[in-house]
């Protein structure tokens, strides 16, 4: 039986960043009992996103795989009761360490960064950071969006942990 521990201590489970009132800035971490190579191979592959991201419904490569700086991937998600279509462009990719993507098309500018690091016992700490600076009416929703993203990211990392640890 898998038991997920939620704690502000990233060494033992999950932690979530602070709410930014000027925008969205949410960091969520998990420690997964799998090697960095396994966690990166699965979590950095956009084709796997619908399996572990609750809100992502579809993925379409706009450039040919594999993932590299300059790759563009379209996602369709359902978030806060709305259908969102957006395209991420990979702006940084250091395999096994860091992946940063920015929206090149979508409802508002967003940047997502994954980092991975090996921790004791052959485990991996994955950190997922979402930063965005909504404009116009969306700016008024930023505090609510931050809370919703925080909840969604926590669920997503729990699902990722379950999928990888059951392998």
Regions found by a protein language model. Name each.
Residues 4-6, 12-64, 68, 165:
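Hydrophobic ligand-binding cavity/cleft-lining segments
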Residues 26, 84, 110:
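Exposed loop/turn and edge beta-strand positions of beta-sandwich/beta-sheet ligand-binding modules
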Residues 31, 50, 60-107, 121, ...:
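Glycine-rich portal/gate segments that line the openings of hydrophobic small-molecule binding cavities
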Residues 32-34, 79-81, 132-136:
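Beta-strand elements of well-folded, non-transmembrane domains
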Residues 35, 45-48, 95, 149, ...:
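Amphipathic alpha-helical protein-protein interaction surfaces
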Residues 102-155, 160:
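Beta-strand/loop substructures that line and gate deep hydrophobic ligand-binding cavities in soluble
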């Amino acid at each position: 039986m898998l038991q997920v521990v939620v704690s502000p201590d990233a060494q033992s489970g999950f932690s979530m960043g602070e709410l930014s009132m000027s925008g969205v800035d949410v960091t969520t971490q998990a420690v997964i009992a799998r090697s960095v190579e396994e966690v990166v191979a699965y979590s950095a592959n956009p084709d796997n996103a619908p399996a572990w991201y609750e809100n992502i419904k579809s993925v379409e490569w706009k450039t040919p795989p594999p993932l590299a700086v300059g790759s563009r991937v379209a996602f369709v998600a359902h978030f806060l009761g709305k259908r969102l279509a957006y395209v991420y462009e990979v702006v940084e990719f250091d395999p096994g360490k860091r992946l940063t993507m920015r929206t090149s098309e979508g409802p508002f500018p967003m940047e997502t960064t994954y980092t991975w690091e090996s921790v004791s016992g052959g485990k991996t700490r994955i950190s997922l950071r979402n930063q965005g600076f909504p404009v116009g009416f969306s700016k008024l929703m930023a505090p609510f969006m931050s809370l919703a993203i925080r909840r969604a990211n926590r669920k997503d990392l729990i699902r990722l942990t379950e999928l990888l640890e059951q392998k």
